Amino acid sequence: MKAEQKHTPMMQQYLKLKAENPEILLFYRMGDFYELFYDDAKRASQLLDISLTKRGASAGEPIPMAGVPFHAVEGYLAKLVQLGESVAICEQIGDPATSKGPVERKVVRIVTPGTVTDEALLSERIDNLIAAIYQHNGKFGYATLDVTSGRFQLVEPETEEAMAAELQRTAPRELLFPEDFEAVHLMSNRNGNRRRPVWEFELDTAKQQLNQQFGTRDLVGFGVEHASLGLCAAGCLIQYVKDTQRTALPHIRSLTFDRQDHSVILDAATRRNLELTQNLSGGTDNTLAEVLDHCATPMGSRMLKRWLHQPMRCVDTLNNRLDAIGEIKDQSLFTDIQPIFKQIGDIERILARLALRSARPRDMARLRHAMQQLPELEAVTSSLAHPYLKKLAQFAAPMDEVCDLLERAIKENPPVVIREGGVIAEGYNAELDEWRKLADGATEYLEKLEADERERHGIDTLKVGYNAVHGFFIQVSRGQSHLVPPHYVRRQTLKNAERYIIPELKEHEDKVLNSKSKALAVEKKLWEELFDLLMPNLEKIQNLASAISQLDVLQNLAERADSLDYCRPTLNKEAGISIQAGRHPVVEQVTSEPFIANPIELSSNRKMLIITGPNMGGKSTYMRQTALIALMAHIGSYVPAESAHIGSLDRIFTRIGASDDLASGRSTFMVEMTETANILHNATKNSLVLMDEIGRGTSTYDGLSLAWASAEWLATQIGAMTLFATHYFELTELPNLLPNLANVHLDAVEHGDSIAFMHAVQEGAASKSYGLAVAGLAGVPKPVIKNARNKLSQLEQLGQGNDSARPSTVDVANQLSLIPEPSDVEQALSNIDPDDLTPRQALEELYRLKKML
């Protein structure tokens, strides 16, 4: 006997469908429930906290089973998607009444974290991306797709560090990778990783898939034809999305190559340390996005976050944004635009559901409502003068045909789903109106029949009713059932009543049920035709969504600039940063005391600042605010300062704070040194580098030596604009030994055992660190502080007696370098070829090298 014949016909059907979807959970529709069996049931029981039961037996073994009600399935799907799980939805498509065996079923959709479009399964203000990654000869191809907007991009990071930064920037909900992928550590601690066959990443297959999607002969028009690694990833990605959506993807119409030299590159540590959209605790409070994001639409909010994570270098584009923000701000247009945008809502995601033919009736109603706002938006934006704003306003012009179609076709307040009808408006289709009239006339007829029968037969308790099982019936109480005439045919007996049918009522039942069925069939046909009528407008709606998103970000930044007293930065092509009265955009919003604004000056003659001062004095805040102001300027935003001149940057690096990376087995010091090495290898003269407390995780002299050598390398070999905060006061000698360096400090004033932080940046080095005063503020017991003061005095006396050993007096040439010069012996050895030497010559060379030691 074959294995499948040991199972019931229904379980055979289930196992066949499960074999087609082995890696994911299968929701198998049975009546009013979606059931899961075997390992799926066990897994779902744990993930969803639902009961695990057993259903009879199959092949002699009890079958583990779990289930969820069909009407509540969206909530369970949302939880599974959040956990990175994918689910195949299997529906009954056959008619149980006519099925001889198990009712026919098939998988109608696959819900995955990266391809969901249902409103209930998405975070409103965060992009939902699916990505694919490919690796060859140490380089990477990486493609991302936002199914909810059609935005399809690829990039080719050249190092693991760059690839890690891209993964953090895009934060895909689902990540596809080939079976032979080597750098699997890049995907650790991530949900939604999907292993795919290697052949899905083949270049020829990828090009074929992409040309088929875009309806093109080649990819030259997209400027991606030479990005072979990126195309391998993009090909796998588009095939996977087609397989899961099981429908055409008409809104995915282009692919863009994201050139890294067009952006200010932020590595993973920098994104984390600057707290752009996520704070160090993993939340969203007290982040730059929280301060800047007052967008009126969810799609504007998502675009602003993309800008924050990918600042750009094109000065012309940035100045266009700044001009636009300035014009909106000067006219206070944001007060008129915001209320309109709040009514428009999230048409970007409605568009995706429209393209995938999964839009619901209320999506159509929301799209109609958005279209109805466009004439008012056109009136408000008619005064805009800047070409960039005028172009956006043109794309946001009224779409009268679409608006008229939706106004005629969809009821004012349609139901949630089309299943029971009641969606298409009256007057839209004559045939539908006719069938509805027949169905709706049933109520009047039944009321008249009930009154006539009650009067004719003298039965006070007679009622005409309907239920889905027995259809129409006449109900009479048990006490008056003896008054029922002979032509009443009993249909059902209840505890206190009898139910009957008569030929006249049966004839009407057939007519009504037929008209309801016909009306629903016509309505569903009209619903599908509505998608066909809207499809030609897809590109226009896509352009509309993009234009409104951009206008929303610009008006939002104008409002923020006006409300928070930001200034317009001046963007320069040459390197340098000059800020007067700069403020930290986040700290100034959350502090209860007035924020102390500070200047900064970095130029070709002043490349590095050695920053000293007490803990809690504001060094890290000062450094971060400089980076945030520079970043805000590079997204085209006004900045928190009295004035700001920002030169073009290629990268921003931060080495601020560290903690043990337990998952990778790395200590705090190892994390610190790894980040430092990344900076020393990749920073350029056009980079902004923030270095905070290098070397504190090891012994004093090791730490001091590493800090000194790192600062020296940045100053002499790289020439990056650097803010170097330290507690090693020996480093304040560097500006006396090297050109283009300066000392600045944040001061504090002691009053007995207390300390007041001034938070103001002053030229020159700090006089002391105030560490003991800070320890007192933290609550360290007074006897411990007293003992520490005594020990400090002893150490200072020892230090004064051994000044010659202080690192601050050592010549620069003798300083430890992280990348040391080769010795004379090493250079001599490198010039010797052992294969060319006779035994006598080798012996002579050995004596010569010994003398050099």
From Swiss-Prot:
Keywords: ATP-binding, DNA damage, DNA repair, DNA-binding, Nucleotide-binding. SMART domains: MUTSac (SM00534), MUTSd (SM00533). Pfam families: MutS_I (PF01624), MutS_II (PF05188), MutS_III (PF05192), MutS_IV (PF05190), MutS_V (PF00488). One of its GO terms (cellular component) is cytosol. GO terms for molecular function: ATP binding; ATP-dependent DNA damage sensor activity; damaged DNA binding; mismatched DNA binding. One of its GO terms (biological process) is mismatch repair. Signal peptide: none annotated. This protein is involved in the repair of mismatches in DNA. It is possible that it carries out the mismatch recognition step. This protein has a weak ATPase activity. This is DNA mismatch repair protein MutS.
